[in-house]
Amino acid sequence: MVPSADRTRPVVTDADLDVLREQLGRPARGVVGVAARCVCGRPLVVRTSPRLDDGSPFPTTYYLTSPQAVAGASTLEATGQMVGLTEWVRTEPIAAAYQRAHESYLADRSELGDVPEIAGISAGGMPTRVKCLHALLGHALAAGPGVNPVGDEVLLRLRDTWRPDRCTC
């Protein structure tokens, strides 16, 4: 995986937008940067505006786009792994780390603008539960190891079927 996007150079190219359209099956909305890339250079995660062009608030700052990563997170969700992960994030020191991940997510989003409707709301159920593995995996890929404990755990659980350091595009 290519490290998190250079925040001083958040440009999204036309080629990126073409790949995103292919990955998502629709035009990408609110993209302000590519937050993580596959080793081949294609987007894995995009950074999105907290308010879409139509005025809608959009709390998912880090949106997972890689179809293979999305499928992996979906498989984990379908097998009920969020229940055990929610129990896990209620134990120390994981609870404190998950709270810091929540705060990090909010700080990253605040760099993009203030949207009162979603103030204090991060993504994926943070800071007290696990609701969406896609959002948590996207955050982990964008922020790097050690920031989001659940996203890091999802990466570990996917390692036999999907890894960001191996191209499966």
Spans of model-derived segments:
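Preference for intrinsically disordered or flexible, low-complexity segments
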Residues: 2-169
